[in-house]
Amino acid sequence: MKYPRKWKLLLSLLAAVSVMLTGCSGGGLFAGFDMNNLMKPPKLTGSQSGIQQALEQSLKNKSYTLKYPKSGKERSAFIPVDFGKKGAAVLALYKQDGAKIHINVIVEQDGAYRSIDDIEGADSEVYAVQTADLDGDGSVEVIISWLTTSSSDKWLTVYSFDGEEAEHALSLKMEAGFTGMQIVDLDGDSQDELLLMQVDSTNKTAMATLYRLTPDGIDNEHMYKAMMDGNVSPRTTGASPYLDIKTAQLRSGINAVFVDGAKGSEYTITEVLYWNGSGLSNLFYDYTAESVVETMRPSSMLSMDINKDGWIEIPQVSELPGYFDKKASEKLWLTTWYRYDGRVDEETGKDAQKVLSCNINSTDGYYFSFPEEWVSKQSVTIERNSTDRTSSFYAYEWDGESFRRTDLLMTLRAFTSAVWENSGSNAGYEYLGEHGSVVYAVKISRSGADFGIDLDFVKENFVIMADL
């Protein structure tokens, strides 16, 4: 959101005071004090001091604790919101003796700040606060996600700002439970919608619902649903089964929401929700299997733009040569990335375009692309040494009786900057790049040169993941 200049200054000041008001004991000036229990917390100074005064006057100077969103861009207990033609306000999140957080609405009038409303929230912890114009009236709504104590699900409330003269400055437009959420213009009408994903872990079902709002509330005539895989489950207690949710184009002009979900500790799936012209669709949901099969992989790798071409690719994995009979914990993988554009051919199925195949070293933060010849002939494999931080590439070929690893072709290594600067440690290695305190380098053997590997080839296929 773009704030007016005065509100940008206000935001920076409130962020500073929020740090001062965190619920912990401090040293120095605040040594010996518990900030949660201060009757009169540290004051804002200058022209903005009236904001805190307005809050405390509305609370009749009783003690309170400021509450902070756990996630998202807005992390302050004081959140300035520009409501456009309806004005502007500061939303103060606080808690007193009750179980639930309150939202206090503070406005400026004739140079003075005053509280015009105070409403009880949905729960005791705020997960995130977002704003978007969901009903098309030119003024944003406030979307608050609340943590719940019973499960990994959350609760959502959407408020509209009705102005200073209304009985309540904030009015509730909708509320719903959800497991995953995205604000997105999915149907391409230049109006944001609310996409909620809900998992029923008891019945092993899941549903995505696309909500359109009007000034009167939910547009029930234009609410769209799509089935999702109900077998997703969180990997840690209290976590979401959805590992990542992002919006990107499926093809030119068609937005989609890419949802990476966990299936236990070992498997990951990607679901793609998009507008099919008349409703909401899940590209990969198999109604026969009642789950997502096509994108399931024994890997925690998420969908991403792996080659920086502007499109999201979805990974699939297969064992590198020589690792087929290894235990799962010992396997090294070749990850092949596919781009889908959402079109489905009756004969060939979904239009999947192979983008690249690579081995990913997630520990050291890089991947190396395999040429198609290496992939099709299964002619190269890797041995990894976590102690030396090396990945050694070997030829893999038929010896007359079986396939086996033969000549060392090259070694990729991650050095610390200090070790790299010691010429005795990096002998024979050639520089590839660096990130932070890590330097990446390669040593190419004579067999590797005979195999067609040179420094230009390595640089072309070596990618530092942090650069994506």
Where are these regions (language model features)?
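Sec-dependent N-terminal signal peptides of Gram-positive bacterial secreted proteins and lipoproteins
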Residues: 3-29
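Short, well-ordered beta-strand elements
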Residues: 437-447
